[in-house]
């Protein structure tokens, strides 16, 4: 699996791995790179089955597989210890990494993560799946910002959102891969073993997030 590694800003700089959500694209983190690269060697990547890591995913594809293939790619790149920042699905992959490779993960930052999918989040994805089946990739992509951003924020950034829509559509991962990654997200359940995570964990959430209620982060905090 291909990784994008920034040059270390100094000798033995710590490594931070950025894991995006269901879209799978490493470009999700572009706004943060300039700041992070001043202090860290930053690893971004397109998740398997997306972007520059194309593949056909198995029907039983899982969060554990996502974590394993990322860890193997990091080891192959000579990276033994790393911090993880994960958003949504990426936070789930980060928790799996912390559980399966505790000697490697130094710290975990969970952004809008959860223990297991909330009923509200499941409902949102059901609506989006119907859009995918009825309107195809374009309907899925165009609806995505409505589940992510406040209306005022979107209204003030219409050209940016149109450009992001065009990019997402051009690099759409395909319906089958998307649904298999989504099913992996739905099946994930850390409610019985999150307390086994031993590295420091920082939890970040948005109080006005439409897709993931902030209560999910509170539940995660309590479980840790």
Curated annotation (Swiss-Prot):
Identify the SUPFAM superfamilies for this entry. Answer: alpha/beta-Hydrolases
EC number(s) in its UniProt entry?
3.5.1.-
Q: Name one GO molecular function term.
A: hydrolase activity, acting on carbon-nitrogen (but not peptide) bonds, in linear amides
Q: Where is the AB hydrolase-1 domain?
A: 14-115
Hydrolase in keyword set: yes
- Known function: Involved in pyrimidine catabolism. May facilitate the hydrolysis of carbamate, a reaction that can also occur spontaneously.
* HAMAP family linked: RutD
Q: What protein name does the entry list? A: Putative carbamate hydrolase RutD
What organism does the UniProt record list as the source?
Shigella dysenteriae serotype 1 (strain Sd197)
């Amino acid at each position: 699996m291909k990784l994008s590694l920034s040059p270390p800003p100094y000798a033995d700089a710590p490594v931070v791995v950025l894991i995006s959500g269901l879209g799978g694209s490493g470009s999700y983190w572009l706004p943060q790179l300039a700041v992070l690269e001043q202090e860290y060697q930053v690893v971004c990547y397109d998740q398997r089955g997306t972007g520059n890591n194309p593949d056909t995913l198995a029907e039983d594809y899982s969060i554990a597989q996502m974590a394993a293939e990322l860890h193997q790619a990091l080891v192959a790149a000579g990276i033994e210890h790393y911090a993880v920042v994960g958003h949504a699905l990426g936070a789930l992959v980060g928790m799996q990494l912390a559980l399966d490779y505790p000697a490697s993960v130094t710290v975990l930052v969970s952004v809008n993560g959860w223990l297991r999918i909330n009923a509200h989040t499941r409902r949102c994805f059901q609506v989006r799946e119907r859009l995918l089946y009825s309107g195809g990739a374009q309907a899925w992509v165009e609806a995505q910002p409505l589940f992510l951003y406040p209306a005022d924020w979107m209204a003030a950034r219409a050209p940016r959102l149109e450009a992001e829509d065009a990019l997402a559509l051009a690099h759409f991962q395909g319906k089958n891969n998307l649904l298999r990654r989504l099913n992996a997200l739905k099946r994930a359940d850390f409610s019985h073993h999150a307390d086994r995570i031993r590295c420091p964990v920082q939890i970040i959430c948005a109080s006005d997030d439409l897709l993931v209620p902030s209560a999910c982060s509170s539940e995660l905090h309590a479980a840790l």
